[in-house]
């Protein structure tokens, strides 16, 4: 056991943010189908505290899914956000949501070689970004 606590050495901000634009429909909850890489654990691992999702156009009722993949390429569903039907305009913003834990713990810790992926249930366009994360 370490005698000093291990904090993230590099906070990923600005250009280091891991972002993807998702648009291919994927109704699977088992990690198959089209998935979009959000971030990969560095050589000493990564801590992810928050993942934000923002629609870029009109949405219909659907789901955004978050998966973790281990080094053996096993995918596990770790979260879902329900998307509501919204038609954006000058007075109505597009749908948005975030994956975040409410108990103060990180959303997930990615070991070296592990990765975080997202998918969208419907063929609609979403930007997904790990906005609060760091590399150990």
Regions found by a protein language model. Name each.
Residues 93-113:
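Beta-sandwich interaction modules
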Residues 59-81:
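Short, surface-exposed beta-strand/strand-loop-strand elements in extracellular ectodomains
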Residues 54-58, 71, 121-123:
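Short solvent-exposed strand-capping/beta-turn motif centered on an Asx-Ser/Thr pair
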Residues 42-50, 59:
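Extended extracellular/luminal ectodomain segments enriched in beta-structured repeat modules
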């Amino acid at each position: 056991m370490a005698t000093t606590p291990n904090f993230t050495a590099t906070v990923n901000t600005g250009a280091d943010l891991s972002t993807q634009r998702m648009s291919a429909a994927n109704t699977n909850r088992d990690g198959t189908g089209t998935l979009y890489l959000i971030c990969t654990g560095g050589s000493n691992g990564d801590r992810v505290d928050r993942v934000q999702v923002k629609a870029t156009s009109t949405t219909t009722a659907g789901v955004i899914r978050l998966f973790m993949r281990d080094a053996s390429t096993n995918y596990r569903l770790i979260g879902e956000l329900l998307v509501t039907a919204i038609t954006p305009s000058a007075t109505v913003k597009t749908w948005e949501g975030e994956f975040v834990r409410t108990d103060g713990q990180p959303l997930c810790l990615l070991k070296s070689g592990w990765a975080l992926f997202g998918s969208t249930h419907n063929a609609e366009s979403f930007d997904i970004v790990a906005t609060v994360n760091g590399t150990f």
